[in-house]
Curated annotation (Swiss-Prot):
Subunit structure: Forms a complex with SecF. Part of the essential Sec protein translocation apparatus which comprises SecA, SecYEG and auxiliary proteins SecDF. Other proteins may also be involved.
Recorded name of the encoding gene: secD
MF terms in GO: protein-transporting ATPase activity
Residues spanning the membrane: 7-27, 419-439, 446-468, 469-489, 511-531, 538-558
Any Gene Ontology biological process: intracellular protein transmembrane transport
Pfam families found in the cross-reference section: SecD_1st, SecD_SecF_C, SecDF_P1_head
Protein name: Protein translocase subunit SecD
């Protein structure tokens, strides 16, 4: 490879690593602790923060407007200023030269202060929400700290797939198992997010296991209750008359109908064998929000266990349809139900929340049906809910480990100290023993570490104590490649070759020795990553990444620096060890 091509490869690799590392550097070093804590909070907490911040800002703004303040408004009202400019442009009015509180409020097409607040609050809330969610996305791209460094709980969960595959043909079992595990992952994620836990790590491990990390949570009993809870889905008939009566009562008495938990204060408002359930939808935070209520029969008309499949399709007008199939018993029950209850609504209830309440338009006797009236996203959510009823897999906790936050902080200090001291010791030895050539080795070592962190960030891997151990080992192993190259160059110089010829021959002679040792190490790391679990995997990943990056820096970066000294600086000698070799 030519020197220009080699230089281009090095630049491309370093530029790529810079791009991969940017979110990590920005998250850990350029973001203040308060912003990081806010981004790591649950979506419920983010929503509360955005709503409260928007209400506080609008209260300050309206107070200044009432007082007739002549001061320029704060930059945090920039979204409102942009909307105000747009409103003034549409109405043909000029924008003011200075934006005061009164000028901003008067730019909106509302007649009262309350109307302005209702108009402006979504804009301000969106600004705060997007700022936090942007940091949350950035954190997801940064190198994450494992539980041994940050504290929390890790759980290995085994899914019992025997019931799911019972009676399924052998040719279809693999697909059913895969789909069941995908739904297990989705169910666990929804369940953990519902409890307001921040940034959980949920990933499949093997064929029938799931690995879960919950940072900051060290209560074993709470973890067990969150993970092991099982969802329930069923179809309930809606009592439309009772719903209308309760709705009329609610309109006349909105504060006294429900308590803070959305439970009725007066149970006599609905018939005895019914219950009031909320209708829920996903908001802009990805959270379930209550959007009305329905009175439904307590006894389910059809249990979710009878659902055998659910898919999303398109109707004649290209509108999303949710198609579902029932087993033999479910088909019989559903046929009788839909024949008898034409015109009534059938609520689909998942975990006590109504996801949909379609009307029964005609008898469904074929054991399959369709539900319409959704957006594409809502149809996908309903499909997932229906399939989770069919693939309701029993879960069992196989292993659970808890690491305290103080232990995590101490691990960070110890791991960082070991990495820094190990690197410094290696760099010092190379400088003292190999002198000028040692400078090249030191630069290569620093770039080696830089590339390793870049690759960790690129693949969204987690940094653990075992990963740090792998890095420390890699630093020591990377020296070996440089030592082999330096010794070969010294041998060539002893034969009387010039600096350029000795460097070229030295790298050529050292190439296969370096490749042989590193390829065998890489193969060992590959087997450890495939067969190992937990800390062994972390060690194997960092070792494999380090092997590749150390070979790259030894053969590309170090060679480039030698060539630079020869051809650009016109050096005639090279100092390797305690001798100076001359032409």
């Amino acid at each position: 490879m030519s020197k220009k091509a080699r230089f281009g490869v090095v630049l491309v690799v370093l530029a790529a690593c810079s791009g991969f590392l940017f979110p990590t550097l920005q998250w850990y070093f350029l973001t203040d602790a308060q912003t990081r804590q806010r981004a790591l909070s649950s979506r419920e907490q983010i929503k509360e923060y955005a709503v409260q911040s928007a209400e506080r800002d609008l209260a300050d703004l309206t107070r200044l407007a009432r007082a007739g303040s002549d001061e320029d408004i704060s930059a945090r009202y920039a979204p409102l200023v942009a909307a105000a400019r747009q409103n003034l442009s549409y109405s043909g009015r000029p924008a003011p030269s200075r934006w005061t509180a009164a000028a901003l409020v008067s730019a909106f097409p509302v007649k009262s202060e309350q109307g302005f607040v209702l108009y402006a609050r979504p804009l301000m809330e969106q600004t705060y929400r997007e700022a936090v969610l942007k940091m949350k996305r950035r954190q997801a791209q940064a190198v994450k700290l494992g539980l041994d460094l940050s504290g929390g709980t890790s759980v290995v969960i085994k899914a019992d797939l025997s019931e799911v595959t019972k009676g399924v043909p052998d040719a279809e079992r693999a697909a059913i198992r895969s789909e069941a595990m995908a739904l297990v992952l989705s169910t666990l994620e929804n369940r953990i997010n519902r409890f307001g836990l921040s940034e959980p790590v949920i990933r499949r491990q093997g064929e029938d296991r799931v690995y879960v990390e919950i940072p900051g949570l060290t209560d074993r009993d709470r973890v067990h209750s969150i993970v092991m809870g099982r969802g329930v889905l069923a179809f309930h008939l809606v009592d439309d008359d009772a719903t209308q009566k309760l709705l009329d009562h609610y309109r006349n008495n909105p504060q006294g109908t429900f308590d803070a938990a959305h439970q009725l204060h007066d149970l006599s408002l609905v018939p005895e064998h019914t219950s009031v359930l909320g209708v829920y939808r996903k908001d802009s935070y990805g959270l379930d929000v209550r959007d009305g209520f329905l009175v439904v029969k307590k006894e389910p008309a059809l249990e979710g266990r009878h659902i055998r499949d659910a898919t999303v399709s398109s109707g004649r007008a290209n509108e999303p349809l949710v198609l579902f199939d029932l087993d033999h018993e479910g088909a019989r029950i559903f046929s009788e139900l839909t024949t008898k209850e034409i015109g009534r609504r059938l609520a689909i209830v998942s975990d006590g929340k109504i996801r949909s309440a379609p009307a029964i338009r005609e008898p469904i006797t074929a054991g399959s049906g369709s539900i319409s009236g959704f957006s594409a996203e809502e149809a996908q959510n309903l499909k997932t809910a229906l399939r989770s009823a069919w693939l309701n897999v029993a879960l069992e906790i196989e292993n659970q480990q808890v690491v305290g936050a103080s232990m995590g902080e101490e691990s960070i200090r110890q791991g960082t100290r070991a990495l820094v001291w190990g690197l410094c010791a290696v760099l010092l030895f190379m400088l003292v023993w190999y002198q000028e050539a040692g400078v090249n080795a030191c630069v290569a070592q620093l770039l080696n570490l830089y590339i390793m962190f870049g690759v960790l960030s690129a693949f969204n891997l987690t940094l653990t104590l075992s990963s740090i151990a792998g890095m420390i080992l890699t630093i020591g192993m990377a020296v070996d490649a440089n030592v082999v190259v330096f010794e070969r160059i010294r041998e060539e110089l002893a034969l009387g070759k010039s600096r350029g010829a000795a460097v070229c021959s030295g790298f050529e002679r050292a190439f296969w020795a370096i490749m042989d040792s590193n390829v065998t190490t890489f193969i060992a790391a590959l087997f450890l990553s495939v067969l190992g679990t937990g800390p062994i995997k972390g060690f194997a990943y960092s070792l494999a990444i380090g092997v590749v990056s150390s070979v790259f820096t030894a053969l590309f970066v170090s060679r480039l620096m030698f060539d630079y000294g020869t051809e650009v600086l016109h050096k005639k000698t090279v100092r390797i060890g305690w001798r100076i070799a001359r032409v």
